[in-house]
Amino acid sequence: MASIHRPKRGSLAFSPRKRAKSHIPRFRAWPEATGEPRLQGFAGYKVGMTHVIMVDDTKNSLTQGMEISVPVTIIETPAIRVAAIRAYAEDTAGEKAIAEVWATDLDPELKRRIPVPKGDNMAETLGNIGKMIEEGKVSDIRAVTYTLPKSLTGVPKKTPDIMESGISARDLNTKFEYAKSILGTLVSITDVFKTGTLIDTAAITIGKGTQGPAKRWGIQLMKGKHSRQGSLRQIGTLGGFGLRRVSWRVPQMGQTGYHQRTEFNKRILKIGSDGEEVTPEGGFINYGLVRGDYVLIKGSVPGPSKRLIRLRDPIRAKKADLGEPNILHISRESKQG
C-alpha cells in the first residue's frame, strides 16, 4: 500500500510575502577571509540569458569530458567606486557603526541618492579609526561602494545604487590599510572575482502584483462539482468554525513577486570586457547592447533585465573552485524569436 504523504502547499519560509523595502538587495553576513585583501562583494545589472557550449569538468559526471550546453546569465558589471570606510563595534544588541570616513571628489550623480558628506576632516577621522583599532574598540571594517549606471546604455538611469561590502583580510589592521588604499578609487570586477570561482547572488525578483492563492501558493484547483460553483481557483476553507480569526497559515491572495532572494554557489564561467562576444543579433530584449565589462554566470539569476544583482564570496561553499572552464561557443542567436 502506498504511503499517504501530502505536504503543505507552498512554503512559509519566506513569509510574510510582501514587497521588498528597496530594489537594492542586502547581504547580512560575509564569509571568512581568504587570500590577499580585497572586497568581498560586487554589483552589476542583469542583461539576459543565453547558452554556451563547454566541456563538462564536473567530477564523476556522466558527461565528464564531453561537450554540453549550459544556460548562462549575462550581468554587465561596470566599475564601482569606494565612497567611504565604516568601522563597527559590537555591543549587546549586535554590531553598530561607530565611525566612518568619506572620500572627497565623488561623482556628482551620488547627490541624486543621498546628501554627500564633505569629507573635510578625512585625515583626522582616519587617525581616530586607527586609534580605536589599537584600543580594541573596533570589531570590523567595511567599505561603502556605489555603482555607476551612467556608463551603461541598457540601464536608463544615472542615480547610483549604494551598498556595503565586506573586506577579506586576516586582521583589522590589514583591512584598514587596504580600505584606505582603495578609498575614492574605482574597483573593477577583475579586482574582486576570478573566472571559475563560486559566488552567491542576491536580487529582487520580478514583481507580479496581487495574485490568487493558486499562483501565489500553488494550491490544487477545485475538482468536480466544486469547480463548477464559481470557486475553481479558491481555497476550500478559511479555517474551523470555532476560531476567532483567520490563521496566517491559510494560503490567501496577496502580493506575489518583488521579494529578495539569495542563491548560493553560482559559478562564474567567464569575465570579459568586449560586449560583442555575448551580444546577440538585434541586442537583448528589454536591454539592448552590452558595451563594457560583463560576467557569465551558470544558470539563472532572480529578477528581470536591468535589475541590480549583487555578488558575494560564497558563504556556504560546498566544493573547491573547479578552475577556469573550457568554453567552446557562446550563442549569439537573436532572442527576438
From Swiss-Prot:
PANTHER family noted in UniProt: 60S RIBOSOMAL PROTEIN L3-RELATED, LARGE RIBOSOMAL SUBUNIT PROTEIN UL3
Positions of region (Disordered): 1-20
GO CC annotation, single: cytosolic large ribosomal subunit
Pfam family, one: Ribosomal_L3
Entries under InterPro entries matching the protein: L3_arc_euk, Ribosomal_L3_dom_3_arc_sf, Ribosomal_uL3, Ribosomal_uL3_arc, Ribosomal_uL3_CS, Transl_B-barrel_sf
Stated role: One of the primary rRNA binding proteins, it binds directly near the 3'-end of the 23S rRNA, where it nucleates assembly of the 50S subunit.
Record-stated family: Belongs to the universal ribosomal protein uL3 family.
Designated name of the protein: Large ribosomal subunit protein uL3
Key words of the record: Ribonucleoprotein, Ribosomal protein, RNA-binding, rRNA-binding
